[in-house]
Amino acid sequence: MGLRKIIRKALYNLKYTKKKSNSVSGKNFLITGASSGIGLSLTKSLISNNNVIGVYNSNKSNLDNIQSNNLISVKCDFRNYSDFENLNKVISEEKIDVIINCAGTFGSNNQSLENIDFDNLISVFKINSISIIKILQLMEKNNSIRSLSKIVNISSDGGSIKLNNQGNAYIYRLTKSALNSISKNLSVDLYNKYKTEVVTIDPGNVKTGMNPKGFLDADKCSEYILSLVFDKKNDVHGKFINLQNKEIPW
């Protein structure tokens, strides 16, 4: 790593030196993308004092390493609608208080206009955007949605229409923009019906499998997410925010 990048990383992490306490307990979480990255960090952080349904795509090994009776692991490939039946069996039997939707993928490497792979676009759209609607539709049908107090959608400022001054990355941008639109819609519909709060969070430059050169540790990111969502001083419902609780334009 070059000196300039070391300095940039150090300056970036200075914003996140404050320790955030995790006092969340006694709740029932559904976490998508739970087998890696931010989803895995959240699962590990919450599992000792809460129940977690960890939804994974294919690789379960990281969840298997968590030794806890509070964890239910469920395989669901969001690209395959028949897989949602696995999830439906669980959510119809388990109470869910909070959904943290971390599942996401960047898509193919070259996403310039002339190189868009439309099969890949549809696959990424199913993962990044449609999956949360499908989960909530299942919960609506089996009436378990009534217990849902919070939905947290992990998005990206790459989905912000107003902030887009770079172009490119068509697949990633449009699927995250769609997720943002879905979040805003849910914040109206579900709050009116069930008082369910919905927040959309851009975690920033986090080091994950999708972003191996990221600056911020996933555990530190998870710490800030939980503080944002569960600190009663924070009014985050219906907003698109970063980890510093600053609003991002849609």
Locations of the language-model features?
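Conserved glycine-rich Rossmann-like NAD(P)H-binding loop of the short-chain dehydrogenase/reductase
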Residues: 49-63
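C-terminal helical subdomain
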Residues: 196, 200-203, 212-250
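Catalytic loop of short-chain dehydrogenase/reductase
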Residues: 105, 109-125, 148-192
